[in-house]
Amino acid sequence: MTPASANDLLIPEEDLNRLRHCHHHNPHGFYGWHATDDGSVIRTRQIGAEKVELVLGDTQIVMNPIGDDIFAIKLGNREAFDYRLRVTWPGQDPVVTADPYIFLPTLGEMDTYLISEGRHERLWDVLGANVKTYETTLGQVRGTAFAVWAPNAIGVAVIGGFNGWNASQHAMRSLGGSGIWELFIPNIGPGEVYKFAIQTREGHRRDKADPMARLAELPPATGSIVVESDYQWQDSEWMDKRAEIDTATTPMSVYEVHLGSWRWGRSYAELATELVDYVADLGYTHVEFMPVAEHPFGGSWGYQVSGYYAPTSRWGSPDELRKLIDAFHARGIGVIIDWVPAHFPKDDWALARFDGQALYEHPDWRRGEQKDWGTYVFNFGRSEVRNFLVANALYWLEEFHVDGLRVDAVASMLYLDYSREHGEWEPNVYGGRENLEAVQFLQEMNATVQRVHPGALTIAEESTSWPGVTAPTWDGGLGFSLKWNMGWMNDTLEYFSKDPIHRSFHHNELTFSLVYAFSERFVLPISHDEVVHGKGSLWNRMPGDTWNKAAGMRTLLAYMWAHPGKKLLFMGQEIGQRDEWSEAHELPWGVVEGWQGEYHEGISDLVRELNSTYKEVTALHQRDFSGEGFTWNKADDASNNILVFTRHGDDGSQALCVFNLSGTSQPEYQIGVSGGGSWRLVLNTDDEQYHGANNPLPETIEAEKIDRDGFPYTTTLHSPAMSAQFYVWEG
């Protein structure tokens, strides 16, 4: 094969100009190997190189510089062949590499079809940055396949330290009408920082983080990082068992945690020991992480996401997060993460106006912006955007073995007029305020999750009375596994914040929740939202002095654990944190050991005992979502601030739950019950082990055959002030 004149190698000026400014849809049509009428030509662009040689086995042929940092050579052979490039930059040793522009597209036609239809359930395998190895005639070529969806761009390039952030070096090709641009770059592997240089129709260059990046630089840096996982999971037994668990009939108590401030400075790897031990000791069945996807502003607590596929690098690597989740599974504890598909921040290096146009966000500002939060709203009606989000849900379940997604701000998605004044929202096609596209997205997401990952949970933070949030999609519901009971939370906290002397006038705030308790599959949440923004901590909401605050918290928690519904408690409340929570410092662990620390220790001990009793007494969890699991024994004793109800299990078991929410003890309080004989005391918040008043209570109470309040039996018991007792029926 004999080199020919460089004059035969020139690129047409129009194409060269587009390549020069990185707005060519097909750089592969000019770079790499191409057959000609009388042979073949190879071209390569190597910015700043002083020499480029074609390597054919043991032969090296100097390529001709033809301007614009392009080197070319013409050969007599018209048949395709494998080769390498030997590139020399000033002052550096030569580098031998495969040519990026000889590789076939890394996405197939089925991939692009599924993406355009919004049905690619493993989107992360084909978009973003995926490390790959190709077998060639001259040996293996290892590198990274880059692909990005940017349909409005006129050119896209991969930029990074490996090419001096120069968009002319690694221009990507467009895969037809799919809107996807792709390029395989040899010798690029894990640890490389990169972005996509987007050339917009308006003539601007926008350097963007990869929407599908699996890792990002530590904020405030904004680059994406190539990453590859070699983690070996140890939780196969847990994952197999998860698919068989019926959440409706099993105990579920969730410890909500912000990983960065639980204990300051802890990494995922350190939390895999410290946090796991702590949660296991308290007896929780699940832990819920506030958002762990990458986010630029720590003060958002993770709820303004910039990298939906990237675990935040604040606390370690993706594999270290996998290790943390694996450690929870080894202790029999499920892991839920907060997931934010409702909106995203306007940072110009992230998703916002990604290719110069409204792409991920809705183009109409009346639907595309959330003014309260200063964010953009996803365009749920666009198939590729739905695919991005649905696949993201599957990604966390598949790649990180999470057991559930708590979906944030669902109400803001469901209503077109959410937090909008007249004239700031557009009705749907039927003239209503329901966001039909968001409804369709949520139904699709839930149905897909349940089909692909049986046993995985989806939990809605939904603050309105939208019907059928947890009803199946085939029956017109949204299809969530569970819904936060915001009404219960608001009424309960409002009641317990009042002085006992005034509570009799607010008795219905506690009883009203049972009117609708079984209309959805509810979680009772006391979350981070209730201890921030000037609301104070639970401790500070309780009226009275230290003793009364501690007693109030113990009674509140007992009421929560007895009430129908699964449980969620935010970190710090289990020790009676006195100040409201801030992400800027760790929990005040010293409160347990400091002055009056016994009261805080008592609250922690009670939470441990509540979780234990909740698991052991089937009546407390088996019929959380059925009216057959609950009976009022005393709902109307407002004058004494007393509530009594019975929880029922499938096996006929019963748990009598007594709450005295006043400052006055009732030494001989009579209650009608359904079961005669003995009722055994299994929990007493007034006990000395919780630093209560330790009023002496018998281990059992007896129920006699005397009709009372519609029940065939009557029992008489001592109900101490500001306390709760659980009794189980023994017959």
Curated annotation (Swiss-Prot):
Q: In which pathway does it act?
A: Glycan biosynthesis; glycogen biosynthesis
**Keywords assigned by UniProt, alphabetized:** Carbohydrate metabolism, Glycogen biosynthesis, Glycogen metabolism, Glycosyltransferase, Transferase
Q: What class of enzyme is it?
A: transferase
Q: Which GO terms describe its biological process?
A: glycogen biosynthetic process
Q: Which reaction does it catalyse?
A: Transfers a segment of a (1->4)-alpha-D-glucan chain to a primary hydroxy group in a similar glucan chain
Disulfide feature: none
Question: CDD domains under this entry?
Answer: AmyAc_Glg_BE (cd11322), E_set_GBE_prok_N (cd02855)
The keyword Glycosyltransferase is annotated on this UniProt entry: yes
Which branch of life, at top level?
A: Bacteria
Q: What is its EC number?
A: 2.4.1.18
What are the GO MF terms of this UniProt record? 1,4-alpha-glucan branching enzyme activity; cation binding; hydrolase activity, hydrolyzing O-glycosyl compounds
UniProt-annotated catalytic positions = D408, E461
What does the entry list under GO cellular component?
cytosol
Q: Which family does it belong to?
A: Belongs to the glycosyl hydrolase 13 family. GlgB subfamily.
**Role:** Catalyzes the formation of the alpha-1,6-glucosidic linkages in glycogen by scission of a 1,4-alpha-linked oligosaccharide from growing alpha-1,4-glucan chains and the subsequent attachment of the oligosaccharide to the alpha-1,6 position.
- Quaternary structure annotation from Swiss-Prot or TrEMBL: Monomer.
Name of the protein in question: 1,4-alpha-glucan branching enzyme GlgB
Query: Species name for this entry?
Result: Corynebacterium efficiens (strain DSM 44549 / YS-314 / AJ 12310 / JCM 11189 / NBRC 100395)
Q: What is the lineage of its organism?
A: Bacteria, Bacillati, Actinomycetota, Actinomycetes, Mycobacteriales
Q: Which gene encodes it?
A: glgB
